[in-house]
Amino acid sequence: VHFLPAFNGLGAPYWNSDIRGGFYGITQDCDNADLTTAAFKSICYQTRDITELLNKNNIKINSLYIDGGMTANKTFCQLLSNTLQANISKPANIESTALGACIVSQIAEGFSVKDIKLVLEDVYEPDTSSEEFYTKDYLLWKDYIHRTISNIKQ
């Protein structure tokens, strides 16, 4: 099962505001776990789209720092690591917007960015044996996107 999270179109690298989201590959045997996993994978695959663009421009991503409420889900974090085949670091404070505001105020008061220490809660390492599976699955997800785009009336 695959999910296209195009509630208001898709951003980079597709830049198509007309595409709409949906689930693909649903059968009568699918359950909530399949749909949830498909939604998680779609976020991971969107991230992979961006990291592949960076790689094409000679910017190699060996690790990624993540934040936000979704990072409280360990399954998602490991899935992202497996999908990207990169280390995923999660800080103890997952609310980076508030932390960013604090950092800006500290800099305004004369503190250096070097004075601010990031405390990591977890580092997720990729399961290298899953690389082939996630690469094939990612390419299938991209195929669903391209098929959906090709069906949009001009």
Task: Tell me the role of every PLM-derived stretch.
Residues 1-154:
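Glycine/Thr-rich phosphate-binding loops that ligate phosphate moieties of nucleotide
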